[in-house]
């Protein structure tokens, strides 16, 4: 069991924290917390304590629908004692908070709407500067099912079996200077991204891969890690069965 420590000063150091872990050949796990789906502070404390003790490397905070600034700040404040990063996973510019340690500064590369590729980022940039937030440049690419994120973001989703197209997007992100590529099958996706796609991409690109959506078992998570995923994200399973989420985290961290 991890011991709860005094909060580390992570602001301005989150990207380095993650890259250092990856350079030490660690595989990482992010726990995605959707403030809209949290029913009480007691529920959140119970869930996050178990995720932290299992070894999750960071908390992602965000959701596609129904998240207010007040709810976002409230959730981040309840996570304040944990010495792992609290990173905002934004769906729009309303999800910004100086209380977080960092922000995934994302561009939805396969959107048909320029707003989600660069428009929202332009509007948000002065606010981020004012709040003095650390940004982690991240290419967001939606694959397969896509779910609500694909619908809202007007994404031209990449088919599960089109490995070449997914690789082309990943290489484009790498050449643009992004720090990470986040491959997303969508919240609650019936099928996760295929390990074969991950290994195909990894044969062509060296950029760290974040993979999420439809990951409901430790077996699936480990296949993705073995294929080359650097960071696994779980969200829905945390809400529906925290014990399964714990098994996934322990499987990844004990790999």
Curated annotation (Swiss-Prot):
Cofactor(s) of this protein: Mg(2+)
Residues annotated for Mg(2+) binding in this entry? 34, 64
Q: Where in the cell is it found?
A: Cytoplasm
Q: What is its EC number?
A: 2.5.1.41
Which Pfam families does the annotation name?
PcrB
Q: Where does sn-glycerol 1-phosphate bind?
A: 182-188, 213-214, 235-236
Top enzyme category = transferase
Keyword annotations: Cytoplasm, Lipid biosynthesis, Lipid metabolism, Magnesium, Metal-binding, Phospholipid biosynthesis, Phospholipid metabolism, Transferase
The annotated pathway is: Membrane lipid metabolism; glycerophospholipid metabolism
Q: Name one GO biological process term.
A: glycerophospholipid biosynthetic process
Report which reactions are catalysed by this protein: sn-glycerol 1-phosphate + (2E,6E,10E)-geranylgeranyl diphosphate = sn-3-O-(geranylgeranyl)glycerol 1-phosphate + diphosphate
Gene Ontology molecular function: any one:
magnesium ion binding
Q: Known NCBIfam families for this protein? A: GGGP (TIGR01769), GGGP-family (TIGR01768), PRK04169.1-2 (NF003198), PRK04169.1-6 (NF003202)
What is this protein's record name? Geranylgeranylglyceryl phosphate synthase
Species:
Saccharolobus solfataricus (strain ATCC 35092 / DSM 1617 / JCM 11322 / P2) (Sulfolobus solfataricus)
């Amino acid at each position: 069991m991890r011991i709860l420590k005094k909060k580390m000063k992570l602001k301005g150091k989150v990207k380095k924290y993650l890259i250092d872990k990856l350079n030490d050949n660690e595989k990482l796990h992010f726990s995605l917390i959707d403030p809209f789906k949290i029913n009480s502070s007691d529920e959140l404390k119970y869930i996050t304590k178990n995720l932290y003790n299992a070894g999750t490397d960071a908390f992602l905070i965000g959701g596609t629908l129904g998240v207010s600034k007040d709810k976002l700040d409230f959730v981040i404040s309840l996570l304040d004692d944990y010495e792992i990063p609290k990173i905002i996973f934004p769906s729009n510019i309303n999800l910004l908070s100086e209380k977080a340690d960092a922000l995934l500064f994302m561009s939805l590369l396969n959107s048909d709407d320029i707003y989600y590729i660069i428009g929202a980022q332009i509007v948000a940039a002065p606010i981020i500067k004012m709040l003095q937030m650390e940004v982690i440049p991240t290419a967001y690419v939606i694959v397969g099912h896509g779910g609500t994120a694909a619908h809202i973001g007007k994404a031209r989703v990449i088919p599960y079996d089109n490995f070449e197209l997914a690789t082309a997007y990943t290489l484009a992100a790498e050449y643009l200077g992004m720090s990470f590529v986040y491959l997303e099958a969508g919240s609650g996706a019936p099928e996760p991204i295929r390990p074969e796609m991950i290994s195909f991409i990894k044969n062509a690109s060296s950029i760290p891969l974040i993979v999420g959506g439809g990951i409901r078992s430790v077996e699936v998570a480990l296949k993705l890690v073995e294929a080359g995923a650097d960071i696994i994200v779980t969200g829905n399973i945390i809400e529906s069965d925290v014990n399964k989420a714990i098994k996934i985290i322990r499987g990844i961290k004990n790999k």
